[in-house]
Swiss-Prot record:
One of its GO terms (molecular function) is GTP binding. One of its GO terms (biological process) is ribosome biogenesis. The keyword GTP-binding applies. Pfam families: KH_dom-like, MMR_HSR1. It comes from Hyphomonas neptunium (strain ATCC 15444). GTPase that plays an essential role in the late steps of ribosome biogenesis. This is GTPase Der. PROSITE patterns: G_ENGA. Residues 406-490 form the KH-like domain. The gene is der.
Length: 510
């Protein structure tokens, strides 16, 4: 694991700006308003040759009650305890404040290496603030500008000196290896020349390309990438119980929670292991209707949540048991499915429901009726607060992930297609039959299929949905979006023996 570096300091000294610079992209929300960061946020970054596991923390306030600020302080203290090295940031333009001095006292008691940096050190006012920071007792401060990238070389040297030669070399040796080409990428690369959106491509060429690619053989040869973490995003409306659910899963107060709606602002990522399987949990800010997203900061949080959803594998949509399946829930589910993510429906606060049997039947009925595109997504009824039924969530997530990554063998797929068309053929258009001829799965994540059919451009949307639902049931792909592209053209077997239809397909022996 890379060196764990916690960036700490009072509110609005530039911690998240420095965090984003070291990560190399904008992950933490940044705003002039103090207290933007509330949870501790983690990401991998780099400073020169030194790989880092960075922890961005909430601003440190000197409070001791049960307020939101006190809980934010507890998250910061947890980050300090977890880190190998602390980067203590002060504002050079303001100078040392009583809050900075209190924080310095806390760090001295923590018995952990500390690097002191004075941010916003541009200009004469900044120079005076750097000099003032000497009195905090952590040696020579590093003057820097996180916004403009100034002082990074000096920061690197200070971190290296604080670690010492042995710890520094160990940090370099224990860094994770660079990204390796994942299994399955070769398959997609072989199919890259097949543009299923290209309506100028003849069916003969498309069918030939599909068969030449020998998809089933490639899939059989490709090793299962079991070490790849499942990226699970926890999404939902504000105060639905998302952070409480993650804390219950992790068995720790990793996420800041409380009765106030909208506590989580950033998308917080936590690496976790469940029954030997690596999981990357992402807690997100609550999504509201657009007309209720008024503050600039909340708009930034909403955009960050949508970005996290787009990069997830599976989305757990958390809904309050007493307010489930409202319009905003349906819109979030629709967004996840349109982005090609697998979906698990989570009904939280189940410990507060009296008639659980009746409520469960009602919610499942609503899900089937109002979320037809979710395709029978599993529904898990649980309580993040008490842990009731919490053990049912991850098996449902892993099952949907397997469906999301599943592939149907081409032979099985076409046998199913022939049987389906024989029993329920597509309707005629202007007295002329539509003849589905050949189907292949082009990719997984999500499962994507192409169907070759005469007059395919005239196939009714209702029949396409019928085929998608049939694929879902026949190949057990529930809770995941299924994409079907229909292409038209002449009979690819015309002029051959048995030209009135496609030949029988045999299962490949892999």
């Amino acid at each position: 694991m890379p060196l764990k570096l916690a960036i700490v300091g009072r509110p609005n000294v530039g911690k998240s700006t420095l965090f984003n610079r070291l990560v190399g992209k904008k992950i933490a929300l940044v705003d002039d308003q103090p207290g933007v960061t509330r949870d501790r946020k983690m990401a991998d970054g780099r400073l020169a040759s030194l790989p880092l596991s960075l922890i961005d923390t909430a601003g440190f306030d000197n409070v001791n009650d049960d307020s939101l600020e006190a809980r934010m302080r507890a998250q910061t203290e947890a980050a300090i305890a977890e880190a190998d090295l602390v980067l203590f940031l002060v504002d050079a333009r303001v100078g040392v404040t009583p809050e900075d001095e209190t924080f310095a006292g806390l760090l001295r008691k923590a018995n952990i290496p500390v690097v002191l940096a004075a941010n916003k050190a541009e200009g004469r006012a900044g120079e005076a603030g750097v000099f003032d920071a000497f009195r905090l007792g952590f040696g020579e401060p590093v003057g820097l500008s996180a916004e403009h990238g100034e002082g990074m070389a000096e920061l690197y040297e200070s971190i290296r000196n604080a670690l010492g030669p042995e710890a520094y070399e160990r940090a370099l040796e224990e860094a994770e290896p660079d990204y390796e080409r994942g299994a399955g990428e070769d398959i997609l690369e072989k199919l890259a020349h097949i543009d299923i959106e290209d309506t100028t491509l003849s069916d003969d060429d498309l069918v030939a390309a599909i068969e030449a690619a020998d998809i089933d053989a490639d899939v059989a040869e490709a090793p299962v990438q079991s070490d790849r973490p499942i990226r699970l995003a926890i999404v939902g409306r504000p105060n639905a119980g998302k952070s409480t659910l993650i804390n219950q899963l992790l068995q720790s107060d990793r996420m800041l929670t409380g009765p106030e709606a909208g506590i989580t602002r950033d998308s917080i990522t936590v690496n976790w292991e469940w029954e030997g399987r690596q999981i990357r949990l992402v807690d997100t800010a609550g999504l509201r209707r657009k007309n209720k997203v008024q503050e600039r900061l909340e708009r930034m949080s909403t955009a960050e949540t949508i970005r996290s959803l787009k990069y997830a594998d599976i989305v757990a949509l958390v809904m309050d048991a007493h307010e489930a399946m409202e319009k905003q829930d349906l819109q979030i589910a629709d967004l996840a499915l349109r982005e090609g993510r697998g979906v698990v429906l989570v009904i939280s606060k189940w410990d507060t429901v009296e008639d659980t049997d009746g409520a469960a039947r009602h919610i499942r009925d609503l899900a089937n009726r109002l979320m037809p595109n979710a395709g029978g997504a599993p529904v898990v009824f649980l309580s993040g607060l008490t842990g009731r039924n919490i053990e049912k969530l991850m098996p449902a997530v892993v099952k949907v992930y397997k469906d999301w990554t599943a592939r149907a063998k081409t032979g099985d797929l076409n046998r199913w297609l022939r049987h389906t068309v024989e029993h329920h053929p597509p309707p005629s258009v202007q007295g002329k039959r539509i003849k589905p001829r050949y189907m292949a799965q082009m990719k997984a994540r999500p499962p994507t299929f192409v169907l070759i059919a005469s007059r395919g451009d005239q196939m009714p949307e209702g029949y396409k949905r019928y085929l998608v639902n049939g694929i879902r049931e026949a190949f057990d792909m529930h809770g995941v979006p299924i994409r079907l592209f229909v292409r038209q053209g002449k009979n690819p077997y015309a002029g051959k023996v048995g030209a009135d239809g496609p030949p029988r397909h045999k299962r490949r022996n892999n």
